[in-house]
Design a protein with these regions (language model features):
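Glycine-rich phosphate/ribose-binding loops and adjacent secondary-structure elements
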Residues: 10, 15-136
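C-terminal extensions of enzymes
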Residues: 137-219
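Short linear motifs in intrinsically disordered/low-complexity regions
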Residues: 6-9, 13, 119, 189, ...
Length: 219
């Protein structure tokens, strides 16, 4: 109700150079979500967002609500998933019709020494990286990987040097942007599903035995 009141109150007051999105709400209740999606779709807005799925819900609940809700939003308008998420969340969101996302994960995790790679997330505070002279990820062209080793970045983090956090954030943002480029290329090529499965498998998001039996397990 609050969202509908907000949208109705904005008629003729919106800057024409900006886009107005309706936000689908309803927690994890599919019937409420679907009803609200239909109501905001009637307003013919610039785009539509799915909100309220990054405040404690499980990944399984998020994917269920997307499965139930997104089909009731206009297919020809951009769809935005708010406050999400991990690389796996983004891949699963795109597979369910989401076009774009916003999230603090890359920067927040980077500030704590957690960095993303194509083989999964690593914590540079772990002692095993103390003498690791490899870059965060082999072949990565981000500023951190081109010039610094895991060992040196870990030293910066342990010494509470701001550069350590900045390098981790730079790497994570580069990783996310590169993944989004790969997603767009896979969609254009018509092989997104196979790309997603391979990406999740390489990042350790799919259990090998479950995959072999046709069942997926997300962590």
């Amino acid at each position: 109700k609050k969202e509908m009141n907000r949208l109705n109150s904005l008629e003729d007051t919106v800057n024409k150079n900006q886009m107005l999105f309706g936000i689908d709400q309803g927690a994890i209740y599919a019937d409420i979500r679907i009803d609200h999606a239909k109501r905001i779709s009637e307003l013919d807005l610039d785009g539509y967002a799915v909100g309220g799925l990054a405040v404690g819900e499980t990944h399984e609940e998020m994917y269920y609500i997307l499965d139930e809700t997104v089909p009731h939003l206009p297919r020809k308008k951009p769809t935005y998933l708010m406050g999400v998420g991990t690389p796996a969340n983004i891949l699963e969101g795109v597979d369910r019709g989401i076009d774009f996302f916003d999230c603090v994960y890359p920067s927040r995790n980077g500030r704590h020494g957690h960095v993303y790679t194509n083989q999964g997330k690593i914590n540079l505070f772990n002692q095993k990286y103390e003498k690791d002279m490899r870059p965060i990820e082999e072949g990565c062209q981000c500023p951190a990987c081109r010039r610094y080793s895991r060992a040196y970045i870990r030293h910066l983090l342990k010494a509470k040097e701001m550069l350590g956090m900045r390098l981790c954030v730079l790497h994570n943002l580069y990783f996310y942007n590169t993944m989004m480029e790969e997603i767009r290329d896979a969609l254009d090529a018509g092989n997104f599903r196979s790309y997603k499965e391979e990406k999740l498998y390489n990042m350790g998001q799919i259990d090998r035995e479950k995959e072999m039996s046709g069942q997926k397990k997300f962590h």
